[in-house]
C-alpha cells in the first residue's frame, strides 16, 4: 500500500524566520525559506497521523486541511515537539473522538508534568486523550507498523520512526549501531541537519552527510534546518545529488511494505 508523508514543518525550535532577525534568510521571499517547527503528517487511505505536535500544530493542520486525525506519535519531550497538544481539542469536538497519543516513557512523564489539567481533572473543554506508552519495539496504529529508531539528542533519548520504506529522524546527534541497522539501505531517509557549524545536540552538514554515506539510502531529505544554514537555494547548492533540503508542505510517497533488504 502506498502512503504520503508531508513535511508539516522543517525548521528549528525557533522557526524560520526568527523574530527580530535581520539576516537575508529570515527576509527571503522564497516560500521554501518559511520553516515552521519540525513535524510530519502520514496519510494512508484510511489513516492520518502526525509525528509530533509542536507550537505550530494548529496552523499546520489548517494548511494541510486535516479534517480527520487518527493519532499523534511523539519523538521527544522538547517544547517544539509537544507544545501544540492543547489544539487537539478541535478533533475532540468536531469528530467526537478521544485522541490516541503514542509516546516513549520520557514524553509520557513530560506531558503529565507540563499539562496536568489534561490528566488530573474533568474540567470542561480540556483535551481528551488516551496516552499509550511505547517501548523500542515496533507497534501498530490501525494497520500501519511503526518501528522506533532510538537516537541521542546530546543526552536525551529521541525516537525516530521507520514506517514502510521511509525513516524519519529528527533531533539526532548520535545514532547507535543498533539503530543504524534498522534503516540501512532504506529507500527514503529524513534526518535533521541544523547548519554547517558543530552543535552539541544536532547533526551539522558534515555529520549528516557522513551518516547518509553509512546508511546508503536511496534518497535523503534534510529537516530541522536553521536560518544560519542559508536559503533553500544556498543549501541545495552544497548538497550531493541524492540529498535534498526539505521544505514545508513537501509531500513524499512511500510504500508501507518493508523490503527484505532492510
Locate predicted features.
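Core dinuclear metal-dependent hydrolase active-site scaffold
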Residues: 1-51, 55-64, 130-181, 248-262
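A short helix-to-beta-strand connector/capping loop
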Residues: 3, 97-98, 124-130, 142-144, ...
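Glycine/Thr-rich phosphate-binding loops of Rossmann-like dinucleotide-binding domains
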Residues: 15, 59, 82-83, 199, ...
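Active-site metal-binding motif and surrounding structural segment of the metallo-beta-lactamase
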Residues: 48-103, 186-188
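Active-site neighborhood of phospho(di)ester-bond hydrolases with catalytic His/Asp-centered motifs
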Residues: 50-54, 70-78, 103-104, 167-172, ...
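Active-site neighborhood of divalent metal-dependent phosphoester bond hydrolases
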Residues: 95-99, 107-131
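Binuclear metal-ion centers of metallo-dependent hydrolases, dominated by the metallo-beta-lactamase
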Residues: 176-188, 195-262
